[in-house]
Amino acid sequence: MANLNQIQKEVSEILSDQKSMKSDIKAILELLGSQNPTKESLEAVAAKIVNDLTKLINDCPCNKEILEALGNQPKEQLIEQPKEKGKGLNLGKYSYPNYGVGNEELGSSGNPKALTWPFKAPAGWPNQF
């Protein structure tokens, strides 16, 4: 099984191959840009590029070694999973009756003297409306 240095070397080789292919792609695009490209020629060039990249990736021996290394990982996780947080504050509904709020017609208060809308001024208050 390869160690990390060997894998790093192979990955850097693939990276350099990809960079050289990038310059080749630029050259091809410049060549195609100088001509009047057709859709078929562009598709053929794109298919060739995809095939070349796929072949490079599939032929790389580091892929097999990486998969083997991943398969040989220990079953126990080396990283501790975060513990579940407690429930924290329980912010439920009010536990006391909120008399004096709500609308009796809507059933939101058990207080028969709850304020209603439109507001009806109590006797003795000036009439604002």
Curated annotation (Swiss-Prot):
A GO-annotated cellular component? virion component
Where is this chain primarily localised?
virion
Region of interest (Capsid binding), ranges: 122-129
Q: Where in the cell is it found?
A: Virion; Host cell junction, Host plasmodesma
A GO molecular-function annotation: DNA binding
Q: Which UniProt keywords apply?
A: Coiled coil, Disulfide bond, Host cell junction, Virion
InterPro entries hit by this protein: Caulimo_virion-assoc
**Keyword DNA damage assigned:** no
Q: Which residues form a coiled coil?
A: 1-31, 38-59
Q: Which Pfam families match?
A: Cauli_DNA-bind (PF03310)
Similarity remark: Belongs to the caulimovirus ORF III family.
Relate the assembly described in the record: Homotetramer, through coiled-coil domain. Homotrimer when interacts with icosehadral capsid. Interacts with capsid protein, and with Movement protein.
Task: Please give the name of this protein.
Answer: Virion-associated protein
Q: Which organism is it from?
A: Cauliflower mosaic virus (strain BBC) (CaMV)
